[in-house]
Design a protein with these regions (language model features):
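Alpha-solenoid repeat junctions
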Residues: 40, 44, 68-73, 104-111, ...
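Hydrophobic alpha-helical segments and helix pairs
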Residues: 65-111
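Residue-level detector of extended alpha-helical repeat arrays and alpha-solenoid scaffolds
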Residues: 29-33, 61, 97, 131, ...
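Amphipathic alpha-helical scaffolding segments comprising HEAT/armadillo-like alpha-solenoid repeats
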Residues: 11-22, 41-53, 74-87, 109-122, ...
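Short inter-helical turns and helix N-cap capping residues of alpha-solenoid HEAT/ARM repeat scaffolds
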Residues: 29, 56-57, 92-93, 126-127, ...
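Acidic, Ser/Thr- and Gly/Pro-rich intrinsically disordered linkers and low-complexity segments
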Residues: 162-181
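N-terminal alpha-helical scaffold/docking segments in eukaryotic complex subunits
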Residues: 1-74, 216-246
Length: 246
């Protein structure tokens, strides 16, 4: 969002925010206005955020859900906020579920140490949509800048992948599990590239698992350019060392 629009949003009266956002939401359409939602998250007051989270309107609910991430940072002792985002991570609307992951990323942008235990808790949730939000939130390159968060991302990928292997075949076909599998189809590559040594070891262990969904996850990640480059670099380095040993 450019500066002009930022200033414009800040100047909108609270009682006019809903129609303002809805008119510029990009919905219905293939892509909602994420930049506008980010700006709302950065400036909205608590009451407006909590009001929007409860609305039926998809975009306003999206905006409110994402903005709770800032409230979690500002009010770390209020456990009800992370619980609310957790409920939205299992929302019927896919955009709202995505907003829950974005809310956690807002937390991570400010406080990685606050993000990590939330992800660790969510990835053990019985609802696959919540597990998906946890993995998608932490497997974001801009957040994987310190050893503890990189390790947390790999651990989240491992636990979420393992959770699929314990399910019967009929349950694996549900939309939530399919959504989780799809996320793991790219999140592993992000986590591995962020921490190549530990990541490649974990990914090799994953490749050894004899499970159809795990094989799909592995194959999907191997198609990602970021991981293919990492593998090429690793193989080149290994070949060089072998030649030197000769």
């Amino acid at each position: 969002m450019d500066g002009r629009h930022v200033v414009e949003l800040r100047g909108v009266p609270v009682d006019e925010l809903a129609p303002y956002l809805t008119a510029r939401s990009g919905l219905p359409g293939p892509r909602g206005n994420l930049e506008l939602a980010d700006e709302f998250a950065s400036i909205a007051d608590r009451a407006t955020i909590l009001r929007f989270v409860a609305l039926d309107d998809e975009y306003l609910r999206f905006c409110g859900t994402e903005a709770i991430g800032r409230l979690i940072v500002e009010e770390p002792d209020d456990a009800s906020l992370s619980a609310l985002v957790r409920r939205r991570a299992a929302d019927d609307l896919w955009r709202v579920r995505e907003a829950a992951a974005r809310a956690l990323q807002i937390v991570g942008d400010v406080d990685r140490a606050r993000l990590r235990p939330i992800v660790a808790e969510w990835v053990g949730d019985a609802n696959p949509y919540v597990r998906r939000a946890a993995v998608a939130a932490i497997c974001e390159p801009r957040l994987l800048t310190d050893p503890a968060t990189r390790a947390a991302a790999l651990q989240a990928c491992c636990r979420a992948s393992e959770s699929i292997t314990t399910l019967p075949a009929t349950e694996r076909k549900t939309p939530g599990v399919r959504n989780l599998r799809q996320a793991l189809g790219y999140c592993w590559s992000v986590a591995v590239v962020a921490d190549p040594d530990e990541g490649m070891a974990a990914f090799e262990r994953l490749r050894a698992v004899d499970d159809p969904d795990i094989r799909w996850i592995v194959a999907s990640n191997l198609k990602k350019t970021r991981l293919r480059r990492q593998l090429a670099s690793r193989w080149t380095s290994t070949a060089y060392r072998l030649n030197q040993d000769d």
